[in-house]
Amino acid sequence: MSKEIKFSSDARTAMMRGIDILADTVKTTLGPKGRNVVLEKSYGSPLITNDGVTIAKEIELEDHFENMGAKLVSEVASKTNDIAGDGTTTATVLTQAIVREGLKNVTAGANPVGIRRGIELAAETAVASIKEMAIPVHDKSAIAQVATVSSRSEKVGEYISDAMERVGSDGVITIEESKGMQTELDVVEGMQFDRGYLSQYMVSNTEKMVAELDNPYILITDKKISNIQEILPLLEQILKTNRPLLIVADDVDGEALPTLVLNKIKGVFNVVAVKAPGFGDRRKAQLEDLAILTGGTVITEELGLDLKDATLEALGQAAKATVDKDHTTIVEGAGSVDAISDRVAIIKAQIEKTTSDFDREKLQERLAKLAGGVAVVKVGAATETELKAMKLLIEDALNATRAAVEEGIVSGGGTALVNAIAALDKLSEEGDIQTGINIVRRALEEPVRQIAANAGYEGSVIIDKLRSEKVGTGFNAATGQWVNMIEEGIVDPAKVTRSALQNAASVAGLILTTEAVVANKPEPAAPAMPPMDPSMGMGGMM
């Protein structure tokens, strides 16, 4: 396929047109009075959203050069979303502002390499200032404030803060679609895995069809139990303690299962058998997690252990185990705190190293089951369109909250970015490097200008007043009042704010130093078929 090439200002100007189209679409959603954007989908109802990265990903432009500019800004939004989970619209606004001011100077004869160095230096300094401003987040009310600002909903703020309070910062919070119209929070404490009892005759509560074991021993093995003789010595030891037994094994079949069921029905002892969770290496890891949580040992040939030789010391213990037809939940395992902490540290290290999103998700689930719990926010709405929009809002709020817990919070509404300008006053460079610093200085005001504009105010007037206000005071676009942003609960996660600036500066610098753009030439349209002569092709018909 032949290529089309543009150079110098022609290339940068073409990309800038694409950047403007995407950014102008996305930035209308910024702030408490931001508007929605309607996205046409290939099937189903349109999606109504104010999520920056979702909008950016949908935009495809006909002109290849413009489309490349748009895609570079979309990449900024995606990168910010991957790192911080929110702040995608802010990142888009910052990128547009830096590139726009940078192109003016490059067109006027400035050296783009010098400007890029100035942009990078200014961004690095502003990021350090944002980190210094950050206030640690620990209490539930601060978490609720972050979630409320991100989602523009106090109700969502309550759900997220309740979930984080109950499962902890290491817990997993998932978002699902509810079957009803109400949004609900469901929390599972302890370790739960998706395996149920192997026989319904093992239930102790026939009304709920649930097997409940109080203070049980837990046999954990990767072996298949087919012969009751394999575990008979162990069963005799457990019988003397008069405590129930939960068996977690690769499978229980053959004569072993009916023998266990018969003894359960006769009341000889209380036993429930379930299959081990997961498959392959993940099964092995989950069984080890379960053993550490309950203070037991995985009975496996890899360690030279045999079921016939197992003693009570090899069994795990817990305060309670509940088993239904699909799930097993173990609460208050008897494992040592130190062993669990060591295991948590290992899993966290694996999360840091992995490059697979799927592996990361599974590792986080394991971490939650050991260190916290699992909370499920079930989103309900009157229509499918509203449900999709609500789900995106809650996902953003959840990501913002996690980022806040990780690196703290700063004044919201773009105020922290304007406050960071003071740190740039300490930088004194020459020539084009100083020009790059001044470009970032101007760009840091842009989110506040846009938030004000979306709320119907003149951005320049708001910025002029904000410059004279003390640090931390900002403009509440929702009410039109000047307030202490932190005290008012208008806050942003520091991680979101600094990620937006870092990613915007990085891509803007690359665009400004671009000297040539190579795009595929549009394919010429295929010639239309000539109309058919009526006298041809039908001659055989009378």
UniProtKB/Swiss-Prot annotation:
Keyword Nucleotide-binding: yes
Organism: Lactococcus lactis subsp. cremoris (strain SK11)
Keyword field: ATP-binding, Chaperone, Cytoplasm, Isomerase, Nucleotide-binding
Function: Together with its co-chaperonin GroES, plays an essential role in assisting protein folding. The GroEL-GroES system forms a nano-cage that allows encapsulation of the non-native substrate proteins and provides a physical environment optimized to promote and accelerate protein folding.
This protein's name: Chaperonin GroEL
Gene3D superfamilies from the UniProt entry: GroEL (3.50.7.10), GroEL-like equatorial domain (1.10.560.10), TCP-1-like chaperonin intermediate domain (3.30.260.10)
Highest taxon, organism lineage: Bacteria
Classification via SUPFAM superfamilies: GroEL apical domain-like, GroEL equatorial domain-like, GroEL-intermediate domain like
